[in-house]
């Protein structure tokens, strides 16, 4: 038995300079696990609640001392003596202790920090790397990265309404090479943007934030960079979009300020379909607003055979909401964000539900990140096949990519990079 003998929560800062929660868990053997939780900018309204202090005299009200106090008192009392290797029981203990549907009493940030730290301690105790602890000997598949090289929306201060324009190196032979493809395109894009006299400043997730006239111009810049780096768009590198459409959905219309357009769901779907026909787009995330389920059905029926349609704000890593979407034939993929739900056990259940339904699961970071690289191990440990963890700059993003390099090295010859096969939801 790997009994938990001590637990310590603390307030640290994330990649945006905002407070977040870190937790240390000590086992009776002396083994320690540490984890830090991320935080989002564009958040779904049905996400588990991230507990903030609301004290405007500290960190503009964003302090997390209440969440930390919950770890150091109530949660500590409940989990001391529990077996760290019994993750499901530990997470159920946390859920029952909180007693709410959305983890608003203890805070999902407090609960997730404990859940992750316990898993890290248990993996260390067992002598296994974290990905192997999660997935056993079957964990051999590396994820295809979705790299956010142009930022807009809530992640940037520019004219773009769409939040992320991503490159997806699905033609690479390995994860290591996929990372190289992405880095070389990133640097080619930087030169192109610079030569056009635009700013090469980066957004929250490390992508560039150029002030372009339209969304298509942003796509064309990326295609130019792919070509300049010596790669073939569509074959070696595809494009993905995260529209984060809830952010520009107002009064029943999709308001595209960059184009000066106000579109209903059918018109917005037509516009996305035009882009899909014109450009090598293979994935569209949050193409409709989280509450526009009719719009989601229109989008899925129109493009769901040829493009990965990812629900993020739509499903918020919640199996109850996700099941409703599956039953209604909405989307064909789910974005997995551990802090949207608040425990590892619930996260894994959502990934498993996706696989059973023939949906893909994309493991994702948040815009406010830390040096914690747990999601890299989750991506491999669950054989998810895809990961979304930012651009090719900022050390908070590189922490995940570099961990994946280590995992691929550790796997050696049995490491498998799925490439286009990761999009098994497409026909």
From Swiss-Prot:
GO terms for molecular function: magnesium ion binding; phosphopyruvate hydratase activity. It is an enzyme of class 4 (lyase). It catalyses: (2R)-2-phosphoglycerate = phosphoenolpyruvate + H2O. Its EC number is 4.2.1.11. The keyword Metal-binding applies. GO terms for cellular component: cell surface; extracellular region; phosphopyruvate hydratase complex. It comes from the Bacteria. GO terms for biological process: glycolytic process. NCBIfam families: eno. Belongs to the enolase family. PANTHER family: ENOLASE. This is Enolase. It comes from Albidiferax ferrireducens (strain ATCC BAA-621 / DSM 15236 / T118) (Rhodoferax ferrireducens). The lineage of its organism: Bacteria, Pseudomonadati, Pseudomonadota, Betaproteobacteria, Burkholderiales.
């Amino acid at each position: 038995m790997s009994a938990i003998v001590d637990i310590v929560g603390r307030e640290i800062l994330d990649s945006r300079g905002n407070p977040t929660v870190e937790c240390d868990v000590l086992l009776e053997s002396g083994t320690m696990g540490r984890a830090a939780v991320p935080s989002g900018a564009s958040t779904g309204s049905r996400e588990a609640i991230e507990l903030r202090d609301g004290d405007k005299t500290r960190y503009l009200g964003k302090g997390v001392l209440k969440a930390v106090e919950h770890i150091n008192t109530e949660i500590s009392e409940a989990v001391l003596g529990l077996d760290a290797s019994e993750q499901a029981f530990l997470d159920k203990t946390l859920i029952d202790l909180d007693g709410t549907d959305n983890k608003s009493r203890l805070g999902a940030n407090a609960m997730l920090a404990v859940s992750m730290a316990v898993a890290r301690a248990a993996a260390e105790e067992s002598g296994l790397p974290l990905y192997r602890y999660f997935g056993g000997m079957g964990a051999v598949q590396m994820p295809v990265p979705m790299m956010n090289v142009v930022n807009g929306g809530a992640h940037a201060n520019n004219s773009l309404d769409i939040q992320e324009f991503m490159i997806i190196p699905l033609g690479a032979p390995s994860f290591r090479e996929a990372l190289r493809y992405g880095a070389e395109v990133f640097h080619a894009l930087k030169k192109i943007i610079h030569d056009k006299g635009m700013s090469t400043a980066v957004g929250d997730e490390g992508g560039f934030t150029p002030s372009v006239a339209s969304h298509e111009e942003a796509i064309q810049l990326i295609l130019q960079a792919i070509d300049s780096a010596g790669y073939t768009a569509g074959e070696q590198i595809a494009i993905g979009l995260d529209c984060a459409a809830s952010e520009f959905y107002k009064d029943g219309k999709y308001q595209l300020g960059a184009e000066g357009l106000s579109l209903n769901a059918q018109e917005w779907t037509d516009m996305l379909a035009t882009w899909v026909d014109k450009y090598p787009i293979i994935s569209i995330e949050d193409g409709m607003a989280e509450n526009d389920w009719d719009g989601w059905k229109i989008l899925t029926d129109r493009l769901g055979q040829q493009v990965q349609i990812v629900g993020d704000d739509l499903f918020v890593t919640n199996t109850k909401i996700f099941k409703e979407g599956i039953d209604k034939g909405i989307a064909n993929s789910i974005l997995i964000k551990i802090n949207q739900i608040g425990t590892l056990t619930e996260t894994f259940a959502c990934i498993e539900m996706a696989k059973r339904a023939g949906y893909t699961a994309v493991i994702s970071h948040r815009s406010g990140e830390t040096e914690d690289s747990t999601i890299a191990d989750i991506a491999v440990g669950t054989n998810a096949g895809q990961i979304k963890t930012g651009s090719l700059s900022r050390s908070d993003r590189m922490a995940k990519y570099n961990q994946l390099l280590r995992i691929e090295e550790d796997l050696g010859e049995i490491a498998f990079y799925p490439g286009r096969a990761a999009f098994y939801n497409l026909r």
